[in-house]
Amino acid sequence: MGMQYDVKSQYAIASGLVLPFRTRVKAFQFGAATSSAGTVGLYDNFAIAGTYTRTTTVATVTAVRHGLIVGDWAFIDWSGGANPTDDFYQVATVVDANTFTVAVVNTGDPSGVATVYNDVLVISTVSTGNDVFNIIPGEGILAQNGVRVFLENSVPLTVYYG
């Protein structure tokens, strides 16, 4: 396989959709966090609408055909009043094909709406002193529906794709 010449880049300084089309992530660079270490991640732009109930520190999420297994990471966007923080959560248990649980802080509404992004492409923690740069081997990571990012603590991102 020869050199690929059609690699492009996209810069982002806020969470959201950065590439609204099917592509392959070839490399990425997360800049150093400005205030304290931060979690950053890229995930496929495919969301599953769901609901949640919370009992103390456990949120039970119902999202039809979530496809997750214990130990997987999902980005969950909690909607509504006082709710858990939008963030990456590791799946603690899988009840069935439509229900799973995650650990959350014991605060907020006991139930509400949750949007689940179950296809995490890259997740990393960035310190205040160092950038993170990674080249993806082979053909890169396929994002079927585009690339959405979560950037915490003012971490800038450059994603290389093609």
Model-assigned labels for residue ranges:
Residues 1-21, 151-162:
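C-terminal interaction-tip segments
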Residues 18-32:
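Short, surface-exposed binding/anchoring microloops in extracellular/periplasmic proteins
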Residues 26-28, 140-153:
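Noncatalytic modules at the cell exterior or secretory-pathway interfaces
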Residues 33-37, 65-69, 152-154:
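Short proline/glycine-enriched turn/loop motifs at strand-loop junctions of beta-rich domains
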Residues 35-47, 159-160:
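Short, surface-exposed beta-strand/strand-loop-strand elements in extracellular ectodomains
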Residues 48-121:
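Small/polar beta-strand repeat architecture
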Residues 94-95, 125-132:
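Short proline/glycine- and polar residue-rich coil/turn motifs
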Residues 132-140:
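Exposed aromatic-hydrophobic patches
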